[in-house]
Amino acid sequence: MKRSIPELLQSEQPLVMVTAYDYPGGLHAEAAGVDMILVGDSLGNVVLGYESTAPVTLSDMIHHSKAVRRGAPQTFLVVDMPFGTYHTGVTDAMRNAVRIIQETGADAVKMEGSTPEVLQVVDTLSRNGVPVVGHVGLMPQTATAQGGLRVQGKDDDTARRTLEGALALEAAGAFCVVLEAIPARLAKLITDRLQVPTVGIGAGINCDGQVLVTHDLLGIYEGEEKKIAKRYAEVGRVSREAIARYADEVRRREFPTRENSFVMKDDVLDKLY
């Protein structure tokens, strides 16, 4: 059964969140019993083949989120608001967030940053019944302005801004805050200071929950394992090997076999000659 926001807030165990981008992703995540599913704009990187999340559109997010919801009707669903959908004013942000909730069946939206403009959006959405997940630390949508995809909060300035940003998001009405790629001790400090849950990715063990990109934890893409993730399977290698075996059997005329084929009666076939 889907957990409500109060139930998530009162959880005594660490919250488990994974990403999903399609029907089977939602299906498997729900069957595994995760607490929350995030349809992240990371779909731009891991599904659509973009170099960043910037090209991902609102239509992309809605399309993929609807598929995830069909696969996971009973899991709390959070949908990223992609770049540009909450940066042009509160009215536009409200309209876009309502579209996401109405068209996908999502339970909450997520947005990055803690600028005054973003905080105003968070405040307006939360006061109007749209639950919001905040996000501080490394923010992929604007990573170029942060000096690239690298750890945040290791110096006095960025550590203080990260802490203050998380506190400001809570004050604005965010019911949960994602902490990405920050030192573990900073994440613990933020978690201790906040009354709402923190969900970490590359933020150490002391957050109230953890999130991973499913493609990372399944090993869908082969190569070096990311520092912030752990590979629990080798789905990429297994998939490649399976497709190669299929191709080999087709070329050797070993597939399909009789077991994979349909039959017909001799007299029916004879009438065709």
From Swiss-Prot:
3-methyl-2-oxobutanoate binds at residues 41-42, 80, 110. Pathway: Cofactor biosynthesis; (R)-pantothenate biosynthesis; (R)-pantoate from 3-methyl-2-oxobutanoate: step 1/2. It is an enzyme of class 2 (transferase). The active site is at residue 180. It comes from the Bacteria. The lineage of its organism: Bacteria, Thermotogati, Deinococcota, Deinococci, Deinococcales. Mg(2+) binds at residues 41, 80, 112. GO terms for cellular component: cytoplasm. It is found in: Cytoplasm. This is 3-methyl-2-oxobutanoate hydroxymethyltransferase. Its cofactor is Mg(2+). Its EC number is 2.1.2.11. Catalyzes the reversible reaction in which hydroxymethyl group from 5,10-methylenetetrahydrofolate is transferred onto alpha-ketoisovalerate to form ketopantoate. It catalyses: 3-methyl-2-oxobutanoate + (6R)-5,10-methylene-5,6,7,8-tetrahydrofolate + H2O = 2-dehydropantoate + (6S)-5,6,7,8-tetrahydrofolate. Keywords: Cytoplasm, Magnesium, Metal-binding, Pantothenate biosynthesis, Transferase. CDD domains: KPHMT-like. Homodecamer; pentamer of dimers. InterPro entries: Pantoate_hydroxy_MeTrfase, Pyrv/PenolPyrv_kinase-like_dom, Pyrv_kinase-like_dom_sf. Binds 1 Mg(2+) ion per subunit. GO terms for biological process: pantothenate biosynthetic process. NCBIfam families: panB, PRK00311.1. Belongs to the PanB family. One of its GO terms (molecular function) is magnesium ion binding. It holds the Pfam family Pantoate_transf. It comes from Deinococcus deserti (strain DSM 17065 / CIP 109153 / LMG 22923 / VCD115).
